[in-house]
Regions:
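Extracytoplasmic
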Residues: 133, 140, 162-166, 180, ...
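Amphipathic alpha-helical segments with strong coiled-coil propensity
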Residues: 1-55, 59-61
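Zn2+-dependent peptidoglycan hydrolase active-site motif and core
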Residues: 162, 179-214
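Short glycine/threonine/proline-enriched tight-turn/helix- or strand-capping micro-motif at secondary-structure
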Residues: 114-133, 146-179, 202-203, 247
């Protein structure tokens, strides 16, 4: 009996030892899991801090970039207002020369824009200009459209919208602007932030060439298609050689891409 009892005690002792070993193993495994989870949590927290810091840096850069874009847009708007003023003066001068009044019944109608008074020769030139829509020569010998006409959203800053009153054409350093169509130099003006600006009149149409230096024409010069007007200056904002080219009918801005061949 005692032998049997001894065996039973021995078996229970072995079982208890095995159970205890299992519990110790489970405890160690649990502690390892806790430690691993803690390390992973710390790693996630570090990654989140790095991500937050990166986002803050990106937002700071975006804010700075957006401020630069808004500043450039404000400068462009100021130059546009100056060009619009020059065109209004040219329209008023055309009416004065023809004996017409600047406040005709047509122009005081709601929404009407000031229009040129045209002589028969000016009307013929305007018709010639209009008939060449979509077939005119580029105002540079070689170039590409850097920025299109009209309103556009920034590709990476969705809250930023810009407006371009013409097209901006990038070309090689030292390139010259040339007349897109025959006409008369209506105005030459040095505009702060925009270099020299030349307005060429084609009846009641105008083409405008902005950001020039070393001019080759003067007011009242008759110019032919492709005639050199002046050298294109480097853009102060990005250092590129860019001509800004605009088209007007009377005082209304038009899309130059509709007028220049394959633009």
């Amino acid at each position: 009996y005692r032998k049997k009892q001894g065996n039973q005690i021995k078996e229970r002792t072995t079982l208890l030892q095995e159970t205890n070993t299992k519990l110790i193993d489970q405890k160690e495994e649990k502690q390892q899991l806790i430690a691993q989870n803690k390390r992973e949590q710390e790693k996630l927290e570090d990654e989140k801090k790095q991500q937050d810091a990166l986002i803050a840096t990106i937002r700071e850069k975006e804010s700075s970039y957006a401020a630069q874009i808004n500043k450039k847009q404000a400068e462009a708007n100021r130059i546009d207002r100056e060009i619009d003023r020059l065109i209004r003066e040219a329209i008023a001068a055309s009416k004065k020369e023809s004996g017409a009044t600047t406040n005709s019944e047509t122009e005081i109608k709601k929404g009407a824009m000031p229009t040129f008074a045209l002589t028969p020769a000016a009307k013929a030139l305007a018709n010639d200009f209009a008939s060449n829509k979509g077939r005119m020569d580029w105002p540079v010998e070689r170039g590409r459209v850097y920025k299109k006409f009209g309103t556009s959203k920034h590709p990476t800053l969705p809250n930023i919208t810009t407006y371009n009153s013409g097209v901006e054409i990038e070309t090689a350093p030292g390139s010259v602007a040339r007349a897109a169509f025959k006409g008369t130099v209506q105005q030459v003006q040095l505009i702060r932030g925009g270099g020299y600006t030349i307005l060429i009149r084609h009846g009641n149409y105008l083409t405008v060439y902005q950001n020039l230096k070393n001019l080759k024409v003067k007011v009242n010069d008759q110019v032919s298609t492709k005639q050199a007007l002046g050298e294109i200056a480097e853009n102060s904002f990005n250092g590129k050689t860019i001509l800004k080219f605009l088209v007007y009918k009377d005082s209304e801005r038009l899309n130059p891409e509709d007028w220049i061949y394959n633009m």
